[in-house]
Amino acid sequence: MKSDQLGRVLSDDDLPTKLSIANEFKAFVKKNSVPRDLIHPYFLTLSRAIKSREDPQLTSVCFSCFCHLFKRVSIQDKQLLDDSATVAVVTDLLIDRLSDRSTGVRATANKVLLDYWVLVPQAVAVAMRQSAVVSSSHVTLGESLKWLQSVFDLSSAFNFSAFVQPVVDMLRYPQLQSSVCELLKKVYSVSDRRELEECLAATGVNEMLKKSILNGLPGGNSSSAVSDPKTTAPRSLSSQKSVASKPAQQPNSQEPGNENAPSSSLAFLNSLPNFRVDSLAPENVYSASDLESKINNMHVAFADKESEKNWSLREKHVTQIRKLLRGNALQDYPSQFAAAYKSVIDGVLKSATSLRTTLSNQGLLLVKESGQLGGNAFVDPVMDIVFPQIIRLTGQMKKITSNNAHITVCGLLTSATFSTKLINHVTSATVEKNAQPRTFAAVWLRILILSHSQTHKSAMQNHGGLDQIEKAIAKGLQDPTPSVKENMRVTYWSFAEYWPSEADKIYRKLDTKAKAMLDKVNPSGAKNAPIKKPAPRESLKEVMRRSRESSVNRDANAPSATAPPQRAKMGAPQRTSSGLVGRSLSGSNLTDRSNRLSSTSTSSRDQQRAVSDSTRPTQMTRPVSGRLSREPSLTRSSRDQSLTRSSRETVSREPSLTRGSRELPKQRVDQNRQRVPSISRDSRYGQRPVGSRESSRQSRESSLDPSRESSLAPSVHSSTAISRESSLPRDDLPSYDVEMDEDDPFVTQQLKLSLKQEDAMSQPEETMNEVTTAEATATTAPMKIPKSTPPRESTPPNSSPFVLAKSPATQGVSTSPATGKSASPPATAEDELSRDLNGESKHLKEVDDDNGSMDADERIESDVVMGDAEESAANFEPSEVEPAGVQLGLKSPKRETPTSALQGNEQAEPESHDAVADSQSHGADSADLQSEPRNVPVSPPTTSDASNVPILSPRPIHPAKFELDSDAMIVDEVAPEVNTVIDAQTQAEETPTEEIPAVVKVGFDAEAKSEPTEQTEAVKTSDTATEPGEPVDIPNSEQGPSTEPTELAKSAGSVEHVTEAIQEDPFGDALPAKQENGAKASDEIETDHTKSNNTESDGPVSAHDESEPMEICDSDNDAVDNGTNPDTKCQDQQDSTTPPMDFSSHDLKDELNTSSPESLTALLSNPDQYKEILDHVPAELFLLCVILFSESHVMDAQSVISRDTNLALSTASSMVMVCARDVYPSDSRWSQATVEELKHVTVTCLEWLTKLVNESSEASTLLATNKRYRTSLVHLLSTSVELHKQKFGDVTHNSLIHVIESMDKLSQRPPDKRTSRAFLEAPSPSPDSSLVEDVTDKLSHVTVKENFKTIRILPPQLASGQLIFPGSEVTWSKLELERLARSPSCSDSNEAILDAVSRDKVSVTQLSTLASRIPELEDVDLVTATILAYLHISHPPALTTAALVAIKQVLIKPELKLSMGHVTEIFSTLNHVNSHIDSRSPLAAAIEELVADLLTHTDSSEMLEFLLLSRSRDSKTQNKLLLLNTVYHVITPDLLPSYETQLLALITELISDPDPLVRRVTVGLVVRVLRVSPEMEGTISLAIKSKMDLVRYYMGA
């Protein structure tokens, strides 16, 4: 068959013949080769048949033939497809098929194009670049992206440069963004991305979207994107993304200087899980009001406690805010978004602290991303609220929550602005009891140091932040938890990079082991660490060494080595005790234990603790947790050495009394012998440490060695002390806070064994005298102990009972802390106790000075105190007061201080230093443990400055209370001294809408009182005014508006009534002057005043109370009556004499519209005639003329209008809307006003509206109780928010948003039950407001075109079934086209405007200019396609309206012919726009009118088929309403039988829709179907069943 025959058959014959020929040709192509000269004609003929779209079946068969023909030719000869004419025909058809509605057709066309590119790559790529990737159909663009991905998968060498710009331009389509991002990441993962960066920058792609694309490429973010000053991401994000590909850094690397060493940047945050901003679908907003409405809708779910009902809503809202952060709100409305986020931060924190893990995670992610994406604008205002709660979450046991909270704090710290509060929040976590916050706090400190040490170095240093960080790091490096120390070491080196001198101070205070561990993580290597060798600490070590050597020498030279054993001399009972003690304290065993000292630092700490014990004042301390505190730094070596010395110092003495005795023996008093303090047995209930069993075994072995037994003597005083304590019940034993480890059973066992031999011990007088003489003559200078790391804070008692467990370093010279001289023992134990009690008050005040200034020689004292002192003090209870970490002593009964005790202090002798060295010997003199009594004051610990401060009184210091005088406050707030005079007439007329304090003296200060602009204009200064001290009374704001505003308004016309209003008493009683004329008004004012006090009021409230009368006197009122303000009175008299004008004789409305400014100024000069003028003209026109031509009387005009609250609110709202939208007739006064005049009118009306909403109780009650009325006003104002910003700027824009917010807040106010029901039944915006009627009510209904006549279907009139044919209604198109004729035009060409539209850079003026040129264009296909593609993107209402006007111009173009494909494309676009706007918006009416215009260009059957087959079941309410209304007007009697099934399915589905409006319109559709075809009633009744009663009601049956 020839090509011309095929073309003739496909164009002329009937449909069955065409289908038959097409199928035959397809069978021929499948089996036979095609002649070379017929290939191009065949392609051309089939292409024309497919594009004609005559029949869907024929189109499908022809396209199948086309594809088979292409396959046959490619098999036959590939060169045949390389012809330029063939390439043009084939590619044109295939690209056209990419936009087909059928998915299978689009997939086939895409596959054929890919095969064609393999054969002819250059030609096909050029065709795709010129047509497909720049198409106006987003469907074609999506298929083009698929084709490009397939091509790149086939060949990575594909030249993508020509496609970069159009592909980037596709990012303006939200539905294509994911595909574009995927393609770009795939292409530029193997290519140089500089071309992509340049293209993204030139196109102006959304910054966040650009970052998401570039971050997915190898290498992270680009330098240009990071350095872009417009980016809203914080500094930390840019730094972290620049190193995203680097491996995570490990702070504990074993190789210093490695790449895993600590870094000076914030790149380590990338290794933290969930720190990066994850991918989430963005959500865009269309205006600031849209954003605020979305946030306001979340307040209900966040309001109360979490429950099963609201937790899912909270999670949904939190996720929605996260999507909004990724949308356009952050770039277009940053300040409004930040304010909205702050308003819901409490609810977000409730979600973050929830026990539900999913909700908590979402809340924490939102808080983190608010800082990462929003920057410091989102973090700084809520810092004090967010940080404490999130830091508290890090201590939870649930690891997921604690880790997420840690990541959240990290994200906030990288975004917050530096302040000292930030450091306070972080350092507070370093002192938490829980280890987790302390571990995380090290990382937070590092972030602070790296972020702010360079830029805010002086601020950190001058405001205390540096000191806090330094203390926190020093504390963390010595923390008992390994993880805290591990993280803090890394933080230390970051700190040392910026503050080397402060870091060096911390380093020098560490011990050797801590320094070694710190050097391991040094980034510059341990060899370069600033190690400062401390001063030599060999003093204690040398003492121990000399002690061991002396002990060995004594054992070698002891006479007991060769002499017979002394067991017979000392008695049998000594054998067991001496053997056990001697064996356990043998020289070899002591040497082994001494070698266990880990380092010099340990000995140094013991020595420092000994100094602390020796310099502490004598006092008893309170118990700590019912047991003695354990000092971990005490080693077994020091305990053994103390035991050794104690055993060797003990000499044979007479037995002491047991605890049961309460009388001092006379012989002990005479000999002035001291007693050893008793040992407390409040141990850990028999716990045995490691090694104690071995010590017991060695003790038992030593008991069998007679030579060892003979070399030792029992400890007399230790056993005496134990005996004294053993007689007391265990529960009554006092607990002391000591540093020594008295829980060690090893020490306790030795003392128990010595106790058994207490009664059998005897000490000859000769031995005692020898020991005393030796100690008195062998006095040497005390040893010096170098300073070391301060031990932990702990307060030993004034007399430590564990003398046997003390280190030899503690047995130094006893000195007096008051005089610094040696202290001699008292005469008796009773004298010693008296001396302690007497000296306690003197020494306690000097503890801090002595601790800091005393030399080491003076601080080395003994820890031995008289045992009787302890016995006496044990009867007293310890104090429970422990302020500031300092423990106070016991409160002992008053006792007289004996003279002998005081004399004994003057005869003090220093203790011999040899006693310390000789304490290690194992000779027979081991019984000289406690030979001398000592008064040992104990110094407080030296861990910190705060702990060294002595607390002399437990009473807390309360802050001073400042009480302000109420009268003074009233004067400050109400009566500022300003020489002003208030116009009485103006104040009387403002009474219905203003609320000010009841009586005010003198006047108001502009800053002190937040009054509206109108009132401040009414305030005038005068040289002849009242004196500053003379008050001028102002009527009470609570008195207006009254229940009868007409009566009060009548009283505002003359001075007489004004005076009566002023003289009204604030408590309801009229003043005497001229009461008869104003009695009625006074009663009304008093009634309204009482009501206003009982209801809520948003206006300012007077500072006075009824129980406290204000300062008011008759002289003040007389001053007003006598004419204090003569100007006002004269003006009132002059106005009252003006004869009233008769307005009934001429057209006042026309006069206001057409008169000259001078005539209008004269006409509006008398405010007394305003009420009559308002009865003849609309309120909007009247107020407009007053504002423009008689501005001094604006307050009067507003007062007259405010008599009707409904009229006042409606007038102000409609004028605000009209000024922005220009919806006024061309011959009215509105059209003659300039933009600046309209802006002035808008500002004046907004101020008036603000005052009405916030200060008028009547207006606020009306808005709070009548939801329908409030919703109408809010909708009226919200539709012009964006227009205000574009036309007048941010001033009116922000004020309008404030008014809308104030109205919305009133919706949450509970209605007052005493409110009249007249408020609840108030009408919609005033009937007098004709403009409001035209713009709101008329535009909320459906507009369709049938037979070229406008038909409006009003839902209330569905019952009668009649259609209204109004003749003079104002439609949307008429208003917009009139505005289009008056709007300015630009000089850009059509091509330039279309290019701006395609790049989403077009303005409203350009769109309006393009719409005005459409009637002159011959070809509107390109314009239509470009505008339709533009409408697929969300835009502000002004741009959308202008684009719809252009579509309107296209649809009303004469002789326009549209195919069904064009109709469906336009309807789909309008339906898409309709789904993103409010159904109450005028744009909804615009779309309905455009659909009505579209129906005139299509066949009803095809349109109904399209509507019923292409409807989506998950569409929004707006789409359902548009579908129902369109079907309503497409239905005809001829079409019902063919589409009965589909129509019933639609009705059955939507009549049960959750939205009541959808159900109501569906009922209207059923009524229409039954009226068109009554025979379908049975079928419909069976389908909808119970809904038929409602249908019959509407039909009037």
Swiss-Prot record:
Entry keyword annotation includes Mitochondrion: no
Cellular component per GO, a single term: microtubule organizing center
Extent of Acidic residues compositional bias: 1108-1119
First and last residues of every HEAT repeat: 1537-1573
Keywords: Cell cycle, Cell division, Coiled coil, Cytoplasm, Cytoskeleton, Microtubule, Mitosis, Nucleus
Compositional bias segments (type: Polar residues): 610-622, 632-645, 709-726, 791-801, 808-822, 918-933, 1013-1025, 1036-1045, 1122-1139
Subunit (UniProt): Interacts with microtubules.
Task performed by this protein: Microtubule binding protein that promotes the stabilization of dynamic microtubules. Required for mitotic spindle formation.
PANTHER family, alphabetized: CLASP, CLIP-ASSOCIATING PROTEIN
Protein name listed in UniProt: Protein STU1
Biological source species: Yarrowia lipolytica (strain CLIB 122 / E 150) (Yeast)
